[in-house]
Amino acid sequence: MIVRKSPREIEIMKAAGKIVANSLRLAKEIASKDVTTDYINTEVEKFIVRQGGIPIFKGYRGFPKSICTSINEEVVHGIPGQRKLRNGDILSIDVGVGYRKYVADAALTIPIGEITAEAQRLIDACEKSLWLAIKAIKSNEMLSIISRTIQEYVEDN
């Protein structure tokens, strides 16, 4: 059952989302050659806490860090560690924040330095398909329509 949120609840949800968005911006600024994903985790965690948020991944089912990081072909939801980022890496970061009983979660793909044309094409296709899917969302729209929008664009590009 979907419960409508009050204007106050929506404002709190927006605030949680803003903390996530700004956390991802910070991660993107920090992520560069020779930086470890553990360092990114530490800085993002400090930022979240300063904003009054709670990094919700930390401790969830034993997860030891505040953000999820995956480099290149690593499976999503990787644990930040001491590996230094290298030129050409593709870094995926997932951030989840609890704020006043609500949760926001988002992910971002960050190219490190110069990446291959193929990698950039894949990143671009994924981002474009996201915006097409958002545009396709309408009240009472079936999820399959949105999923098809994503699939068709990615397969064609």
Language model regions located:
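Active-site neighborhoods and metal-handling regions in enzymes and metal-associated proteins
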Residues: 1-157
